[in-house]
């Protein structure tokens, strides 16, 4: 993702350069600044209060508001050199959501997990960890979901999100079983 600020004229860009220090920004011939988020540093010099960044001055326009791009505005407040960059929270949330959970699901992997759960080793592992044999309901539902909705990235992300929230709600670890076993052994 690259964020771009475009100026109306090259003269405005040239006049702006004398009032600010910019690091990590590439400047095009068309009069645009481009940078990758997190690499941008801009400091307004003290004498800029009379320059293009007079009190309350605002630069806006920025990349075409595509799904990946961010609409931002840069404001200087009171000539103190502070700049705020505002990014659209909706775009940030969409971007986080698109990278946080996978969009694809491997049906082969789901099938392997299902057969592993039903195997003797899988049942032994379940008995050792949780004190009981398992019916493999999670693996069956994952495999069924993969067969039916495995090619829909939105539904796959929602499924992974639901699984994470369900796992957080249940959170039974082997430590709980061992605590129960110790209390029964001590009686």
From Swiss-Prot:
Which controlled-vocabulary keywords does the entry list?
A: Meiosis, Sporulation
Q: What InterPro entries does its record include?
A: Pants/Emi1-like
Q: Which GO terms describe its biological process?
A: ascospore formation; mitochondrion organization
Please list every transmembrane segment annotated in the UniProt record, as residue ranges.
none
S-S bridge residues: none
User: Carries keyword DNA repair?
Assistant: no
The family classification in the record reads: Belongs to the EMI1 family.
Q: What does this protein do?
A: Involved in sporulation. Required for the full activation of the early meiotic inducer IME1.
What is the protein's given name? Early meiotic induction protein 1
Which species? Answer: Saccharomyces cerevisiae (strain ATCC 204508 / S288c) (Baker's yeast)
